[in-house]
């Protein structure tokens, strides 16, 4: 399918779901904006995860799982990922042969190397290589891996060629110098399908890489959530910023804030931004990223939004000293997972009664469900903006602006007038 056809399909998908699930008609209940596509629909992913295994002949294979299975389809170069990934995979494969590092077998729970995670900073060109292992590497293997990374960075051969069967040409970098700023071993001892463990050991460079969304810098560790298409994420967030219509005085709540990507992006135009996220590590990252950028008008909380927000406003019913009445937020931003907003969170939004809601969605079906609820409880859907962040896939992001009605549906009073009993002739 051509990229133009993909964009047309995705915009229709959003419109159809809003109609079918939400009962919302394009051009009647809301304004549909033309989808924002990519300049280049390839090589846009800054993150790739490759399972590692062995084929029936004992050869090392790396690639992707076949649909709904754990059978690995060998693939060194996916056209959606960075072109340096294949160079790194080839080098790691040779290193495994050189140091006799076995792939992990999830059926018998034997072996060492489970996955290879590669992250790339598109604005900084920094690369992170993270090996997910069942146990910590032997010292000689770890030291050998560091030498491989140093050689990749220098543009020379990546192999130590210590075993008699090594083929130095298979791991030659062809003179291309990489910028691997972080080499991490993530240890996952659990016999589960969860990819990453909790323990990280940095073998080379920093425990993180850096990248930007707009002019906001982020530190990204193996465990960090970060948008996989940062260039198009900037397009998405600029649209969210436009819909928020901030003047510099508003109180903004970001109710699925993650590591603070949207919160920090909006903070430069807001009076105060509050982020809420249930994952403690994400909030730590958000606070660190705020400090990294010198942003002091953002505050982050761990917990469920409906609980955090209620407690916050009970403790701060008075003016906060800035001259802004903080008992009522001006804008709420939500960027939920594919399952959409929790029912209690939607209740919280209505109770908080913001002037505007900016809903960032990665699933137009659950978006339609949630918009139906909000439209029935005092909010008008103003604009719907599809954004393609994942070319050559079926996924589409959507940004929606909702505005509070001056009078909520439940506030209307029905009055019945019997004209037959009235004299309506002029005096």
Regions found by a protein language model. Give the residues of each.
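Extended interfacial segments that mediate partner engagement and assembly in macromolecular machines
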Residues: 1-105, 123
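Short, solvent-exposed loop/turn elements at beta->coil junctions and helix N-caps
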Residues: 33-40, 106, 114-119, 385-389
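Internal alpha/beta scaffold segment
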Residues: 72-114, 134-156, 175-184
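Rossmann-like S-adenosyl-L-methionine
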Residues: 136-143, 147-427
